[in-house]
Amino acid sequence: MLRNRDYARGRAQVESYGSAPVIMYEPLSGRHGNFFDPAYSAIAVNPDWMRRFDKVHAQAARSLPLPQIDSTRRWRELDSSMSSDALLMNVFCTPEVAKSAAIRSALGVEDSAEPIFGWKARVPLTNGRFDRTEVDMRLGSLLVEAKLTEVGFQTRTAAIVEAYRDFDTVFDHDRLPRAEIATSRWMRASEFPENASQEFESIVADPAVVSNVDTIFRPPGEPGYAAYQLIRSVLAAYAADCSFCVIHDERRPDLREEWFQIMAAVKSAALSVRLKILTWQELAAHLPEPLQGFLDVKYGIVSPGKLPSAIGASAELAD
């Protein structure tokens, strides 16, 4: 947060409310504080890319002040300093990056197609329909999931995950990480029905030990799966005959471990070799120097063997 706060100085932005604030940037005079200038210029003239700004920030009404420049403008997800989609577009919308032979080699992509952001995968379900899966990016035959600061890869109930047509074909169920999905709020003991609260009767009935403390419980949840986003994306890659890569920050080994768990549960060797992992730091080594400087100052992302610049070094990028 300190790095983002320093980078934000002199740019059109506000800070969210709460104990874990984020910086929200506004567009101004053809520039956007959350974006590398050449990337944003390329986005602005590409209607498909610009359409990504249609996604309104879901928490804006209760967690964000009004924009400073245009108070009628609604905050977008891509305005957030914590947006992994913004980071992804900063990299791949910068001219010549997606066509770079070094980048294609790092990603294992042979064709030089234009990036598609928010690609609709239409993963088939057992009922003959398709889900509304949106993959962060498709680059030729490669699907990409981008991560920055997100907590994890979400969880879903078993009923939802097992409703995908190819779930049994692709995965060994027993090797997938499980999770209990909460289906109701935490409850106090006094709210439980008679047959569920009898264990407290011996205490409650004794005035000598009665207490004002009302024990809190969470009723059992539904069985589910962890890393749902990864499971879904692997199924999308299988259905579309694509490869799939997770790009994450090397400072997040927890995300890497989650991905390894999912890869280990894939049955097919032919599909397994199409599943990849890459860090932003590894990718940075192949990027143009000006973009590397932007990633360093704004995100603290530098190529392997280098140290991030000191906080306070952002003045040279301000204009």
Protein language model features and the residues they cover:
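Nuclease-adjacent, charged terminal/linker segments that flank catalytic cores
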Residues: 1-127, 309-319
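Short, well-structured alpha-helical interface segments that form or flank functional binding sites
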Residues: 82, 86, 90, 129-132, ...
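Short, flexible loop/turn elements at secondary-structure junctions
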Residues: 93-95, 123-125, 139-141, 147-150, ...
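Active-site metal-binding core of divalent-cation-utilizing nuclease and nuclease-like domains
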Residues: 113-140, 150, 186-193, 222-225
